[in-house]
Amino acid sequence: CRYQQYFAVKAMLERIKQDKKGGVVWHTQGSGKSITMVYITKKIMEDKEIQNPQVVIATDRVDLDKQIHKTFNRIGVEAARATTGNNLTELIKNEKIRVITTVVNKFETVVKSGVTVDAPNTFILVDEGHRTQYGEINRRMQEVFKGAIYISFTGTPIMKKDKNIFDKFGGLIHKYSLDDALKDKAIVCLLY
């Protein structure tokens, strides 16, 4: 993994183990947020202090969900992909399923089913959380996963008075800016 991924995972693990709270990983586009999600999931699963963890990776688009699901499985972290709201409900209820990828709109069906999870070691990794976590979708997720630790991954955080991603998720965990990525030559400018 790249250094920003290593330090982000280290900071996330410290935050969830010491403070029992989530926050925001602000890494610019193209810097490997999906792989960072895989690594933090792997660390959570391997940590002996975190008993019976379950990790849910929530995206806002089907193509992102498919991509993240493939990335997890390709790297060797077995993830189940929720194909429908009813399927998500069944995956959540199945205690043998440790990692789930899903699209956020499927939580409406889970809420209607009445299924809730109040386990202390449930982690929700929200891809591009600035797009979906200020209204009904977030309310549904919170209703299903009552005591979960939420971590948002974003390249473009919202910091308005009424919509502030850092207030919503519990502060900044790690930042890797566009300038950092350009300096490292991890990304390049497009001129047109």
What positions do the PLM features span?
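RecA-like P-loop NTPase motor core of helicase/translocase proteins
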Residues: 1-192
